From Swiss-Prot:
Pfam families named among the record's database cross-references: EFG_C, EFG_III, EFG_IV, GTP_EFTU, GTP_EFTU_D2
GO biological process terms held by the UniProt record: ribosome disassembly
Residues reported in the UniProt entry to bind GTP: 17-24, 88-92, 142-145
Protein name according to UniProt: Elongation factor G
UniProt GO molecular function: GTP binding; GTPase activity; guanosine tetraphosphate binding; translation elongation factor activity
Family from the record: Belongs to the TRAFAC class translation factor GTPase superfamily. Classic translation factor GTPase family. EF-G/EF-2 subfamily.
Function per UniProt: Catalyzes the GTP-dependent ribosomal translocation step during translation elongation. During this step, the ribosome changes from the pre-translocational (PRE) to the post-translocational (POST) state as the newly formed A-site-bound peptidyl-tRNA and P-site-bound deacylated tRNA move to the P and E sites, respectively. Catalyzes the coordinated movement of the two tRNA molecules, the mRNA and conformational changes in the ribosome.
Entry's Gene Ontology cellular component terms: cytoplasm
Subcellular location: Cytoplasm
Keywords: Cytoplasm, Elongation factor, GTP-binding, Nucleotide-binding, Protein biosynthesis
Domain tr-type G per the UniProt entry, residue ranges: 8-290
Length: 701
């Protein structure tokens, strides 16, 4: 089957923002204008097409990023048909894992900001993630009809707080209630959308007199930015020649794709203004799959890297970036094809798990209706139905051309609660439900507490766990009681020690013999991408046979799960196996595993252990009148205030506070500031807990 849409006309984009910048409404409008959904959904009345889980509609926030395929030919049908795959990403900090996962498979992003509140803490997180994956992006300043909306202020904030070179390609005409349309700086015309047909049509007029000077100045800056794309344009510009319309577009496009500049547009999705122009800008300025850096992957165990071209005839390689459970068809695995093609009924090889699976049916999602497809090609995003062993971040590839596209790193959960089923009948269903949810979301973990026999679930924040329990009730009909949230403490060692672990059992017949000498050293904890555990083998001359060494490592790692102070897992340990002995007959893997865990247990006690607690980065936005109270309260919670800034909504206080002190903070902050302050927090790192706190926890533990 030949390609319907040439690869040059593909755009895989994400729409990202923080909570409430109006991201889902923006996506909704895009679906409306591109003709995929005939009735517009409003997030206010819970009917939006990308928010298809019940809880999302109730809470008005987006949790799972739905991938939607749309087609667009431009506001004036001036382009051949382009295929735009849109991934709507969640903006709530508890779901940053979803955002990270989506950015990974995108070629470009539209970052939505609120015209009045501007850059918020969450926007910084998203921006940082986009930088990490080098995603070219443009900005849409939304809600220009809101009180206090100011386009240029937001553009400045993006420059200062996110360190991006923002280049406006539009200006708003009027603001707040008087927001009428936009000035297109490329065409130097004013665009007014027609309210009678919800913005499907528009008219071009001359720029209002009062704005001509401002528009000229902004256009000059835009042309200068375009001229810096290459020497030819620069020379032309410096000699005072005019750059043509096409040259300006090409200059801006090249620099956007190189991640040198970020183009800024504005509008109000809710009022049907501006989104249409954003779609045109996506086609004009964001890259097609073959214009971004080719994806790299490891092709063997030595870590040899290769790239894969965006080509239908290359070997097949795709990345599974999301698993969702659908009430009608079961498991959906969303994947992005980087190279090659795949027909339904063919087998793919999962190179991370080393397993082969047959792809039965494939669908493309259009918000909430599905279209069955027979074949996917390079650049496509689709979902496969019923793959058994695939988890998020796995690579699907051609069995004869194995490749592992970069593995994703998932954050450690910081908060845990105990859950128990309300009735015996729910017990088994709960196990199945939690297993499925953990498969969908790697930042969510499930374990059974050995002492109490309780099921403990851990995640990235209170909202995250609320939603998990909620989904259990709705999708799997499991009623459960939740305990109080518990902080996920950890333990560490503070000094290096040499320890010996010896396990000998002679009881007639075959005995057991394992003997190891291990050096344990603490690793620095404040490393962003630091390792939690490093195992070094320094055995020479076979004093411990090679086949038993993995067993020693396993014994040490398993023992690290149970600390010696209060039973919390140990972090940040380097273990060096340097000596030991074995017995020809009695030694086996089990004996060495036990010897390893004995050494770890003994060593942890001798190595001056300490308790670690999770520290959160907290940002509070508050009116100036309550600033003293807020800072005082943060100090009472053992917080360290890192700095203060002016924000459009008041003072912004940045602090680091232990998670254990942050429970119920939302309620306390509301009552202290009469509901006028807001806060956001995310995990920063683990730090040693003060001795009085540690003692109390150890007594309890």
């Amino acid at each position: 089957m030949a390609r319907k849409t040439p690869i040059k006309r593909y755009r895989n984009i994400g729409i990202c923002a923080h909570v409430d910048a109006g991201k889902t409404t923006t996506t909704e409008r895009i679906l409306y204008y591109t003709g995929r959904s005939h009735k517009m959904g409003e997030t206010h009345d819970g009917a939006s097409t990308t928010d298809w889980m019940e809880q999302e509609q109730e809470r008005g926030i987006t949790i799972t990023s739905a991938a939607v395929t749309t087609f667009w030919q431009g506001m004036d049908k001036q382009y051949p048909e382009h295929r735009i795959n849109i991934i709507d990403t969640p903006g709530h900090v508890d779901f940053t894992i979803e955002v990270e996962r989506s950015l990974r498979v995108l070629d470009g992003a539209v970052v939505v900001f609120c015209g009045s509140s501007g850059v918020e803490p969450q926007s910084e997180t998203v921006w940082r993630q986009a930088n990490k994956y080098e995603v070219p992006r443009m900005v849409f300043v939304n809600k220009m009809d809101r009180a206090g909306a100011n386009f240029m202020r937001v553009v400045e904030q993006i420059r200062n707080r996110l360190g991006a070179t923002t280049v406006p390609i539009q200006l708003p005409i009027g603001a707040e209630d008087d927001f009428e349309g936009i000035v297109d700086l490329l065409r130097m015309k004013a665009i007014y959308w027609n309210e009678a047909d919800q913005g499907m049509t528009y008219e071009l007029r001359d720029i209002p007199e009062s704005m001509k000077a401002e528009a000229e100045k902004a256009r000059e800056q835009m042309i200068e930015a375009a001229a810096e794309a290459n020497e030819e344009y620069m020379d032309k510009y410096l000699e005072g020649e005019e750059l043509t319309y096409e040259e300006i577009k090409k200059g801006l496009r090249d620099r956007t794709i190189a991640n040198e500049i970020v183009l800024a547009t504005c509008g109000s999705a809710f009022k049907n203004k501006g989104v249409q122009a954003v779609l045109d800008a996506v086609i004009e300025f964001l890259p097609a799959p073959d214009e971004v850096k080719a994806i790299r992957g490891e092709v063997d165990d030595e870590g040899t890297e290769e790239t894969r071209p965006v080509d239908d005839d290359a070997p097949f390689a795709a990345l599974a970036f999301k698993i969702a459970t659908d009430p009608f068809v079961g498991t959906l695995t969303f994947f992005r094809v980087y190279s090659g093609k795949l027909e339904s009924g063919n087998a793919v090889f999962n190179s991370v798990k080393g397993k082969k699976e047959r792809v039965g049916r494939m669908v493309q999602m259009h918000a909430n209706d599905r279209e069955e497809i027979k074949e996917v090609l390079a650049g496509d995003i689709a979902a496969a139905i019923g793959l058994k062993n695939v988890t998020t971040g796995d690579t699907l590839c051609d069995e004869n051309n194995k490749i592992v596209l970069e593995r994703m790193e998932f954050p450690e959960p910081v908060i845990s609660v105990a859950v128990e089923p309300k009735s015996k009948a729910d017990q088994e269903k709960m196990g199945v439900a939690l297993g499925k949810l953990a498969q969908e979301d790697p930042s969510f973990r499930v374990r059974t507490d050995e002492e109490s026999g309780q099921t403990i679930i851990s995640g990235m924040g209170e909202l995250h766990l609320d939603i998990i329990v909620d989904r259990m009730r709705r999708e799997f009909k499991v009623e459960a009681n939740i305990g109080k949230p518990q902080v996920a403490y950890r333990e560490c060692i503070r000094k290096p020690v040499d320890v010996e672990g010896k396990f000998v059992r002679q009881s007639g017949g075959r005995g057991q013999y394992g003997h190891v000498k291990v050096k344990l050293e603490p690793l620095p904890l404040d490393d962003e991408d630091g390792e939690n555990f490093i195992f070094v083998n320094e055995i020479v001359g076979g004093v411990v046979p090679k086949e038993y060494i993995p067993a020693v490592q396993q014994g040490i790692e398993e023992q690290m799960q149970n600390g010696c102070l209060a039973g919390y897992p140990l972090l940040g340990i380097k273990a060096t196996l340097y000596d030991g002995s074995y017995h020809d007959v009695d030694s086996n893997e089990m004996a060495f595993k036990i010897a390893g865990s004995m050494a770890m247990k003994k060593g942890a006690l001798e190595a001056n252990p300490a308790l670690l607690e999770p520290i959160m980065k907290v940002e509070v936005v508050t009116p100036e009148d309550y600033m003293g109270d807020v800072v005082g309260d943060l100090n009472r919670r053992r917080g360290l205030v890192q700095g203060m800034d002016e924000g459009p909504a008041g003072k912004v206080i940045r602090a680091e506070v232990p998670l254990s002190e942050m429970f119920g903070y939302a309620t306390d902050l509301r009552s202290a500031t009469q509901g006028r302050a807001s806060y956001a927090m995310e995990f920063s790192r683990y730090m040693e807990a003060p001795s009085n706190i540690a003692e109390a926890i150890i007594k309890k533990g």
